[in-house]
Every structure is written in C-alpha cells, then in structure tokens.
Regions:
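Short, surface-exposed beta-edge/turn micro-motifs
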Residues: 2-4, 37-41, 50
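Short, basic/aromatic beta-hairpin or loop at an interaction surface
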Residues: 8-23
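Short coil-to-beta transition motif at edge beta-strands of beta-rich domains
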Residues: 31-45
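Short Ser/Thr-interspersed hydrophobic loop/turn segments at strand-loop and sheet-helix junctions
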Residues: 44-47, 55
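Short beta-strand-centered aromatic/proline hotspots
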Residues: 51-60
C-alpha cells in the first residue's frame, strides 16, 4: 500500500517548480527519507506557503539529474525520482487552510512527514476534487 507524505520544497535551495514544469520530475534526497516506489509526496512550497504539487515516487537509487535547478550545491548521493502527478493552483491548500487540518508548519516539516493522517487526507481530497 502506498503512503502519503508532505515534504518541504525550499526555493532558496532549489527551483522545484521550474524543474517539475520543465522536466516533469524532481530528484529528492534519500538521506533521512524513507519513501518507497509508489508513495505519494505532496510538496509544500516555501516561497508560496502552500501545497502546490502532488508527485509520485517512481524510482529510487537514482543519480541526480535536476542539478541545473539548484541554487546551492546539492548532495550528489542517490535520490528518489518524484514524478509530477498534478499541480494545484487554488487556495484550499494555503498555509492558513492547512493549519485548520493539523498542519504545524515551521520546523515540523524540515523532514518529510507521513504521520498526520488528517492533514494528508485533506490534501489528497483537494487534489482529487480539483
């Protein structure tokens, strides 16, 4: 069974939006992350303060191939490949809305999380109705 995750995409480190739009995927570090192929990963965009993308883990132990979108030197260890499933452009996934469904923000999303079932179910339902 696939798990759902929420991950924090930091604009100052990488231009994830551009990579997803141009490549159709991004690479995500395997360090301290336990994704499995088939898992769903929602991306909270640091600059927009909202969840904007639904991605799916399609491979692991991949070389980093999105280096052109990085603003800092990324670690070059193996990565997961997260393929774009859908972009959300509405306002139901803004930070203020997410807080109403259990989002803690701040340091709680330094590493991907999957244990907030209420929040992840809400995010998934918004993508499904869009």
């Amino acid at each position: 069974m696939e798990d759902m995750w929420l991950a924090f995409a930091q604009r100052k480190s990488c231009h994830h939006r551009e990579a997803l739009m141009e490549l159709g995927y991004i690479n995500w570090t395997m360090h301290r992350t336990n994704f499995e192929v088939g898992d769903i990963v929602f991306l909270f965009m640091s600059d927009e303060r909202k969840v904007a993308f639904k991605t799916k883990v399609v491979a692991k132990d991949c070389d980093r191939t999105d280096i052109a979108y990085w603003q800092v030197r990324p670690n070059m260890h193996f990565t997961y490949k997260l393929e774009l499933v859908k972009e959300y452009t509405g306002n139901k996934l803004d930070e203020d809305e997410l807080i109403q469904h259990g989002f803690k923000g701040g340091r709680s999303i330094q590493h991907p999380l999957k244990n907030n079932v209420e929040l992840l179910s809400y995010i998934d339902s918004v993508f499904e109705e869009d």
